[in-house]
Design a protein with these regions (language model features):
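Internal, well-ordered alpha/beta segment that forms a basic, Gly-enriched binding/recognition surface
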Residues: 52, 123-223
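Structural motif
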Residues: 135-139, 284-289, 362-363
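C-terminal hydrophobic structural anchor segments
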Residues: 337, 341-374
Length: 374
């Protein structure tokens, strides 16, 4: 499990702020990447838990949550205070933080059972701790210290793949050999840790699946070039979860090929799924703020601004057929390329996708992913 994916899932479920605060309470600065803070808190045993009354055992409902209650005719039911009543079925308990490591030390009994049950049921809060961490620094330097801390906290091995910054457009063979040697060593380390031998045929099949998914994904991204765009760049943000976590599966390839086919039909009909008239087109630079996507989408919608170019999304469309090609591809992550190539990529996507301007999200903890190099 990639800790960054887990952290993004926790953030998207709006638990990120609680987990970040827990990490800061552990001594981690709030200038550190939000993904890292969430992940480090999780490694320390912190879990988001539903608050309950110890006397009754019932969860304490947060009255601010829930959707408006509607009658049989679909009308909103108003309360005596003149405000809409809340549908009890949609209300959720107050949230608090608990520590799984402390819970596991408790003797078996009702308290232990209830505290375990109270931990948030979202899947990202139920993931077991890793047996080892495998780190690569081609997209993020913070990740090096982040994974080192996870390894220290969990007392587990750390396998490191170092990808030097590529200061030329071309990737030289010497650089590929350097990374390939690290992959070969990592394979041996993983064989020792897991007791399993590296299966070349399975790797080739995984590459074939990943390539199929990547090609379909890039085709989906390219449909944003049409005017009007058949969909919004915000849809790409939603689909990214699948291309990041399931790229090497047959199901992901099936899904994105089907999506590409559907978008092709939408373009032929001159239609769009964007729920507003497209007056302006912009490129989005930077990492989306996952729990606040609606807050960004709504004002853009109000002014007819559609995101029709994204730097972040196509970065997951790499194609390679063997370990050498994979090593070369690692040098082509947006944060690993030289400034000339980075500018050229952005100029090309702005031109091809016919944008009127650029919207830049300057993420203070992740400047390279905000288009800032140096």
């Amino acid at each position: 499990m990639y800790p960054e994916n887990q952290a993004a899932g926790i953030a998207a479920n709006r638990y990120g702020e609680l987990m970040c605060q827990a990490a800061e309470d552990l001594g981690y600065d709030n200038d550190i990447c939000g993904y890292a803070r969430i992940s480090l808190a999780y490694a320390a045993g912190v879990r988001v838990s539903r608050k309950y009354d110890p006397e009754t055992g019932e969860y304490i409902i947060d009255p601010s949550t829930g959707k408006p209650l509607k009658d049989a005719d679909g009308n909103v039911v108003m309360g005596e205070d003149g405000k809409p009543k809340k549908d009890p079925k949609t209300q959720t308990p107050y949230l608090q933080l608990d520590n799984l490591l402390e819970i596991e030390k408790l003797p078996d009994g009702p308290e232990k059972e209830k505290r375990l049950e109270a931990i948030s049921p979202i899947r990202q809060m139920r993931i077991p701790q890793p047996d080892f961490v495998l780190c690569c620094n081609n997209i993020c330097n913070c990740m090096t210290k982040w994974y080192e801390n996870i390894a220290r906290m969990c007392n587990i091995p750390l396998i490191m793949i170092d990808i030097p910054y590529n200061n030329t457009v071309e990737v030289h063979d010497e650089n590929v050999k350097y990374v390939r040697a690290q992959f070969d060593k990592a394979i041996k380390q993983l064989e020792e840790l897991t007791g399993k031998k590296f299966d070349e045929k399975k790797f080739e099949q995984a590459c074939a699946n990943a390539n199929r998914t990547a090609k379909a994904w890039l085709k989906v991204c390219d449909f944003l070039q049409y005017k009007p765009a058949p969909y919004s760049g915000f849809d790409l943000f939603n689909h990214m979860a699948d291309v990041v976590t399931a790229r090497a599966t047959v199901a992901a390839g099936d899904a994105f090929e089907l999506l590409a086919k559907d978008l092709e039909e939408t373009v032929k009909k001159g239609e769009t799924t964007t729920p507003f008239p497209e007056k302006y087109r912009v490129m989005f630079e930077g990492i989306p703020c996952w729990p606040k996507l609606p807050a960004l989408f709504k004002p853009l919608k109000t002014h007819g601004v559609n995101v029709t170019a994204v730097v972040y999304a196509p970065a997951f469309g790499f194609v390679y057929n063997n370990i050498d090609e994979m090593a070369r591809a690692y040098y082509k992550a947006p944060n690993s390329v030289c400034i000339e190539q980075g500018v050229d990529w952005r100029e090309g996507i702005c031109r091809d996708n016919k944008v009127d301007g650029v919207l830049v999200h300057y993420n203070r903890s992740c400047k390279p992913w905000s288009g800032l190099h140096g």
